[in-house]
Amino acid sequence: MIQRDPNLLLSWRADQHPDAPMHNDQRYMTGFGNEFATEAVAGSLPIGQNSPQRVAHGLYAEQLSGTAFTAPRGQNRRSWLYRIRPAAVHGSFSLVEQSHFHNDFGAGPVPPDQLRWSPLPLPSVPTDFVDGLYTMAGNGGPEAMSGVGVHVYAANASMQDRFFYDADGELLLVPQQGRLRVHTELGVLALEPQQIGVIPRGMRFRVELLDAAARGYVCENFGGLLRLPDLGPIGANGLANPRDFETPHAAFEQREGTFELVAKFQGHLWRADIGHSPLDVVAWHGNYAPYRYDLRRFNTIGSISFDHPDPSIFTVLTSPSDTHGTANMDFAIFPPRWLVAQHTFRPPWFHRNVASEFMGLVHGVYDAKAEGFAPGGASLHNCMSGHGPDAATFDKASQADLTRPDVIADTMAFMFETRAVLRPTQQALSAAHRQADYQQCWSGLRAAFQPPITEDAT
């Protein structure tokens, strides 16, 4: 292990340090978008080909494609699975009535108000991950293969004999409370708050809760697959480094019984009976796979001279659009960091943005909001809606001693930023946990303008 001078760490906690353990009992392969090969039973992977006449151990070969066959090689995503039964083996689907999780973003007027919500209440009756999903906002849809759905979840029960897949988009999971063990077709992801997980479009999985209750956020990405942002003049290293992304080794379930397969397809939920666990992939190879990332390993970039840089420097993952330089969705975080800029208002500045910003708080306190923005809560600042630090934060930062650094510690906020307006759902607008008085956080910002007295004025 690299030895570091402890005096240089100052107030950083051990679990915020890049050497912090990952707190899991699973095995992982490292790297972003790598070509992986893994088998839970030796000899299951064919050598030198994908689809032999007879697969070892009586398995079936099946390709899972995440991009078009003809996508450029550097962007092509697919994996070959060697499984006990093909994915086609299940009963007929029927429509499920589920009022809270959907893609109904409405066609009516979108209020330009700044919006904020307290945390989604935890359920009082047994509720698993799928039943606990609650749609907040979104844009676009699976038909156009662009845009996102923004959801939160609150659950207190594991998915035992129930499995889910989303044919509409890949799922970015951001746990806020409670640890998860996500059993997927290609292996098991252990997730805890301050880690994220990405489940590819179409990947079947079930979510096991490791604590009494769990809550968090989900971004359903209908557009281009998430990738690492270009670093430009930053260079070859920085932000989220590829080696810190982890993909599970092959693991499988060999269970038969009465199970339920739930699918999200074209904005609706469907269910089918299935007589076995669909998580029966014994071996696989390819680059279309689930992965996780520990946000505490993010290499934060900032100013060491003056001014607060644009928040794009905090981008972890980006979903590209058809317009170069403009993302379908950016996932950015606001982690522990030092602020040392001189002659500078150090918190995030007041802003109006052509993009739309959905924010959440995983842990601690967000440095631009002294009150009201709690872990598990959320805010939405849509296109050109003014936002920025509240009055208390502005007053404190305007008088701060800039000869000393501001150490932003013990925090983790994040943002889903989209190029299209995020349309809040009716249930989010009318929710009891919506903070109707959110705008009052800026009411204390008084006019302090005092024009200079000139000789002409006297």
From Swiss-Prot:
Its recorded reaction(s) are: homogentisate + O2 = 4-maleylacetoacetate + H(+)
Pathway given in the UniProt record: Amino-acid degradation; L-phenylalanine degradation; acetoacetate and fumarate from L-phenylalanine: step 4/6
Q: Which NCBIfam families match?
A: hmgA
UniProt-listed Enzyme Commission number(s): 1.13.11.5
**Which GO terms of the molecular function aspect are on file?**
homogentisate 1,2-dioxygenase activity; iron ion binding
Q: Which GO terms describe its cellular component?
A: cytoplasm
Protein name as annotated: Homogentisate 1,2-dioxygenase
| Cofactors, names only | Fe cation
Question: Which Pfam families does UniProt cross-reference here?
Answer: HgmA_C (PF04209), HgmA_N (PF20510)
Keywords per UniProt: Dioxygenase, Iron, Metal-binding, Oxidoreductase, Phenylalanine catabolism, Tyrosine catabolism
Per its UniProt entry, which superkingdom is the organism in?
A: Bacteria
Tell me which family the UniProt entry assigns to this protein: Belongs to the homogentisate dioxygenase family.
Residues engaged in binding homogentisate: 366, 387
Q: Which PANTHER family match?
A: HOMOGENTISATE 1,2-DIOXYGENASE
Here the disulfide bonds are none
Q: Which HAMAP family match?
A: Homogentis_dioxygen (MF_00334)
Role noted for this protein: Involved in the catabolism of homogentisate (2,5-dihydroxyphenylacetate or 2,5-OH-PhAc), a central intermediate in the degradation of phenylalanine and tyrosine. Catalyzes the oxidative ring cleavage of the aromatic ring of homogentisate to yield maleylacetoacetate.
The GO biological-process annotations, alphabetized, read as: L-phenylalanine catabolic process; tyrosine catabolic process
Instruction: Locate the residues binding Fe cation.
Output: 351, 357, 387
- The transmembrane segments are none
Tell me the active site: 308 (proton acceptor)
Q: What is the lineage of its organism?
A: Bacteria, Pseudomonadati, Pseudomonadota, Gammaproteobacteria, Lysobacterales
Q: What is its quaternary makeup?
A: Hexamer; dimer of trimers.
